[in-house]
Structure formats: structure tokens, C-alpha cells
Amino acid sequence: MDITKDETKIRQLTEQWRKIWSPEDKPFTGEGFENIFAVGENEILVFDNFDNSVVVLHSLQEYLDTWIPVMQNFSYWSIQLEDNLDISIDGDLAVTTFSWVGGGKTKDGQEVKAKQYGTQTWKRLNDKWRLVHEHLTVG
């Protein structure tokens, strides 16, 4: 087990996650999440604080079915991780913590700014790191 190699891979996957969440002026499709999240029913558990409520999701399909319609309201969206990505690895499990800032513009022209704090749990499945738990809270 090579902690440096594992940490590098998780950093790369976290950046891929951020890029998918930053479609800028293109439609948000979620394409690429299948290479980041564990797939299959009840493979993931997501708690996202959104619109004054908590969204709980259990599969990548639920994730896409929830966020694609929300993101269709935006003509532009982009996020950046703040300089605080922390990665802890123990065997086949890893935890990342971070915060992101960003925002965009709705299709009716309203500017939106956002910040969230995140915790993600990664598990090595079939020799590949996969996201199995995500918790995002509005900051």
C-alpha cells in the first residue's frame, strides 16, 4: 500500500468531482460521476444541505436525478475548492474534508453565491478508490 500514490489518486478524483460540478456555461450532466462514485443501489450515502432542507440519497442514479434538474436552472455554475483539502487514509478507507466556494447565474439572470463544507468517505473497491459517502453543508 502506497499512501503517497493513494493520496495523489484521491486528490485527482476530488478534482474530477469539482470539475463535474463546474460546468460553467455548459449544461450540468453529471457525466464522469460513474468513475468517481461507487455504483449500484445502496452503494453510496449522501447528505446534502440544500434549499433549507437535507437531501438524502442512496445511489448515483438518485444523485443524478436530484441534481440534474436543479442545475438546469443555471446558465452558469462553477466552484473552487478552498486551500484546505485534507486527506486521511487507513487501509482501504480514506476521508477527505474541504470547503468550496463558487456560484453562478440562473437562467433568469439572478447571481448566486454559495459555500459548502464537505466530508467525503472513499473506499477501495476492486483496486479503485470510489466515493461511498458525501456530506455537504452550507457554510
Regions found by a protein language model. Name each.
Residues 4, 11, 30-90:
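A solvent-exposed, acidic/Ser-Thr-rich amphipathic alpha-helical stretch
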Residues 95, 115-139:
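Short beta-strand edge/turn micro-motifs at domain boundaries
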Residues 79, 92, 96-98, 113-116:
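Residue-level preference for beta-strand/loop junctions
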Residues 63, 81-87, 100-102, 117-123, ...:
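Hydrophobic/aromatic beta-strand elements that line small-molecule binding cavities or substrate pockets
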Residues 3-4, 107, 124-126:
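Short S/T/G/P-rich N-terminal loop/turn motif that feeds into the first structured element of a domain
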Residues 6-32:
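Short, aromatic-enriched amphipathic alpha-helices that serve as compact interaction elements
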Residues 72-73, 103-113:
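Short, cysteine-centered beta-strand-loop-beta hairpins and adjacent loop/turn segments enriched
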